[in-house]
Amino acid sequence: MNFPYRNIVVLTGAGISAESGIQTFRAQDGLWENHRIEDVATPEGFARDPDLVQDFYNQRRKKLQDPNIEPNAAHLALGRLEAELDGQVTIVTQNIDNLHERGGNKNIIHMHGELLKSRCSVSNQVIEETGDILTGDLCHCCQMPSQMRPHVVWFGEMPLRMGEIYSALETADLFISIGTSGVVYPAAGFVHDAKMHGAHTIEINLEPSAIESEFVEKRYGKASVEVPKLVEELLAHLESNVESA
């Protein structure tokens, strides 16, 4: 690695939150908490059975607020990295939980939305939401009050804040991917974009992802083990540069 790094972009996926007890989508059988993805994570599913979809996310929201669900060592290490690095750390997450915020990160882009927010289905106005969203809960910001929905990007919808993400990738000198499958685009293409702009690239995963060949450096194991080790290395080199200055 070419230390020190000043502009770090970290992409995180379900693997980083799984160790905190957040249930992940099982791609091998297309189920999420025993529901078909097309039933609970598509606009068509919401139109077909809004009660089912609202209940599904209401249950996920309750689970996220369970006192037993806490940031793990990987989240805490990334929070420390942002706080102590002499530069910029941007977290781009595919996760809809708030574990990065609770782990200490502030510069976070939720490209797939946030579970603890709801959104007007017409105006797209977003509000904080810690309780249940029910069919019939309306947003009154529109001339015709409209149904509230989870602030979550469903399959077939455009991810959020893509312009900001690509701007961060253009200036990144280090790109780290943690706990991602490498099969969901556009996120799976971020490593290529970062490399095109000269960034060093690192994959941290339980096993090689579908795009592992794109990465210069690979570290396989639990995120809660590998991420703190990497952060220690990054900050140690930062300190050694300060001492030698």
Curated annotation (Swiss-Prot):
NAD(+) binds at residues 13-32, 94-97, 179-181, 205-207, 223. CDD domains: SIRT5_Af1_CobB. Its EC number is 2.3.1.286. It catalyses: N(6)-acetyl-L-lysyl-[protein] + NAD(+) + H2O = 2''-O-acetyl-ADP-D-ribose + nicotinamide + L-lysyl-[protein]; N(6)-succinyl-L-lysyl-[protein] + NAD(+) + H2O = 2''-O-succinyl-ADP-D-ribose + nicotinamide + L-lysyl-[protein]. Disulfide bonds: none annotated. Residues 1-237 form the Deacetylase sirtuin-type domain. Gene3D superfamilies: SIR2/SIRT2 'Small Domain, TPP-binding domain. Zn(2+) binds at C120, C139. The active site is at H112. Binds 1 zinc ion per subunit. It is found in: Cytoplasm. It comes from the Bacteria. Pfam families: SIR2 (PF02146). Substrate binds at Y57, R60. HAMAP family: Sirtuin_ClassIII. NCBIfam families: PRK00481.1-5. 2 residues (Tyr-57 and Arg-60) present in a large hydrophobic pocket are probably involved in substrate specificity. They are important for desuccinylation activity, but dispensable for deacetylation activity. This is NAD-dependent protein deacylase. It comes from Vibrio vulnificus (strain CMCP6).
